[in-house]
A protein has these predicted regions:
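Conserved glycine-rich cofactor-binding loop
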Residues: 12-13
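The beta1-alpha1 cofactor-binding region of Rossmann-like NAD(H)/NADP(H)-dependent oxidoreductases
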Residues: 53-63, 95
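Substrate-binding pocket helix/loop in short-chain dehydrogenase/reductase
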Residues: 89-90, 94-99
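Active-site helix of classical SDR
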Residues: 113, 149-152
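A short, exposed helix-loop element centered on a Lys and neighboring polar residues
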Residues: 113-114, 158
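Residue(s) in the substrate-gating loop at a strand-loop-helix junction
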Residues: 133
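C-terminal beta-strand-loop-alpha-helix "lid" module of Rossmann-like NAD(P)-dependent dehydrogenases
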Residues: 166-215
Length: 294
């Protein structure tokens, strides 16, 4: 029996790389895709096939997927993992930066789905796994652009699940919480560039401090990869998998608390994070007393 074929975007680092390794170890023929092909040499060494893709370039998407279909003859699993977070106030983030955020996180995902669907429909089977975030259900301060893109993925996935059921194609969403990856450094760098000064500087510091503390308790990318394994390999996958530090707690509280009560809860969490950092800073800056002279 031929191996099932899986495609993983954003395969050059963190979560995507771990997903590719796990699917490969579970017996799939895996194609890891990224703009940074030189950072996937370790995947090549394992036997995972790597290819260039720029999900924001629709011609690149069509060309790469066409090459894979020509080589493998089928596509069983598409994992839409490529994406990034650009934090900053709506007012201060350049609209072109916001558009690019949506082009990568939403329209790139949609183009990939469009491109693999003819093959999956012909097979009368397939599985589309969209890596969203708890930010697709829980809004973060200064994260309107990123949060908006992830809320979009949640809704798109629900509608797509209804569309594709008739063809035997499953649609699954994975919602990571706090995960150790380079996502935070990129998101906070964008935040500092756009809103580090000016009227939103206080809010920028607040959310930056919160993410710094949350990162200390974040989960390894492996937990996301395991969820993708379940989504890809189960006969009857769940429609959603929430994984990682804080995911279940925050999603549960978001469901049961009224909007303003949840806002107050999140504000309290961020205040608590700032107190923790201030205490740590004070301890680091504390001058040891001189030894007593006897």
């Amino acid at each position: 029996m031929d191996k099932k074929v899986a495609i993983v975007t954003g395969g050059s680092s963190g979560i995507g790389k771990e997903i590719a390794k796990h699917l490969y170890r579970n017996g799939m023929e895996v194609y890891a895709l990224s703009r940074r092909v030189d950072e996937m040499n370790d995947l090549d060494d394992l036997g995972i096939k790597t290819k260039f893709i720029d999900v924001a370039d629709y011609d690149s998407v069509e060309s790469t997927i066409s090459d894979i279909v020509d080589e493998a003859g089928r596509i069983d699993v598409l994992v839409n993992n490529a994406g990034f977070g650009a934090f900053g106030s709506v007012e201060q983030v350049d609209i072109r930066e916001g558009e690019y955020q949506f082009k990568v996180n939403v329209f790139g995902v949609m183009k990939l789905i469009q491109t693999v669907l003819p093959t999956m429909r012909a097979q009368k089977s397939g599985r589309i796994i969209n890596i969203s975030s708890i930010d697709g259900k829980v809004a973060s301060l200064m994260g309107s652009w990123y949060v908006g893109s992830k809320f979009a993925i949640e809704g798109i996935s629900d509608a797509l699940r209804l569309e594709l059921k008739q063809f035997g194609i499953d649609v699954v969403v994975v919602e990571p919480g706090a995960i150790k990856s380079n996502w935070r450094s990129i998101a906070m760098s964008k935040l500092k560039q756009s809103s580090g000064d000016g009227p939103y500087a206080k809010s920028a510091r607040k959310i930056s401090d919160f993410f710094e503390v949350a990162y200390k308790y974040s989960s390894k990318p492996m937990v996301v990869a395991r969820a993708v394994d379940q989504a890809a390999l189960s006969k009857r996958p769940k429609t959603r998998y929430a994984v990682g530090s804080g995911a279940h707690t925050l999603l549960c509280l978001r469901r049961i608390l009224p909007d303003k009560a949840f806002d107050a809860f999140m504000d309290g969490l961020m205040d608590c994070a700032q107190k923790i950092l201030n205490k740590e800073k004070a301890q680091r800056n504390q001058i040891d007393p001189e030894p007593e002279v006897k």
